[in-house]
Amino acid sequence: MTVILYSRPGCHLCEDARAMLVRAGAAFEERDIEADDVLFRRYLERIPVIVIDGEETFELVVDEAALRARLGTFAGS
C-alpha cells in the first residue's frame, strides 16, 4: 500500500493528519506542496490530502476511524 500525505508547513490540519497516520502505524511519504508549483496550485485549498494507492482518499478534515478502516488498522493495534 502506498500512502502520500500532501501538506505544507504551518498547516494545523496537516499536523493532525500526520499524527493520525503515525498512530495508525502507516508507512507514508509526506510531500510539501510549497516545494512544487504544480502541487501548490493543485492542493493549496484542499490540504491535507491523503492519497492511498493513487486515490485521493481524504482531504481537509480527516476522520481517524475512517482513515484506520481504509488502512486496515484499528485503534490499539
Per-segment meaning from a language model:
Residues 48-56:
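A short, hydrophobic beta-strand/beta-hairpin element that forms part of a small beta-sheet core
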Residues 27-37, 44:
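Thiol-based oxidoreductase modules, predominantly thioredoxin-like and allied folds used
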Residues 6, 31, 59:
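Small/polar loops that bind or transfer phosphate-bearing groups
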Residues 8, 13, 39-42, 48, ...:
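Accessory recognition modules or surfaces
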Residues 1-24:
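Local sequence-structure signature of Cys/Sec-based thiol-disulfide redox active-site neighborhoods
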Residues 55-77:
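Non-catalytic, surface beta->alpha helical segment in thiol-disulfide oxidoreductase systems
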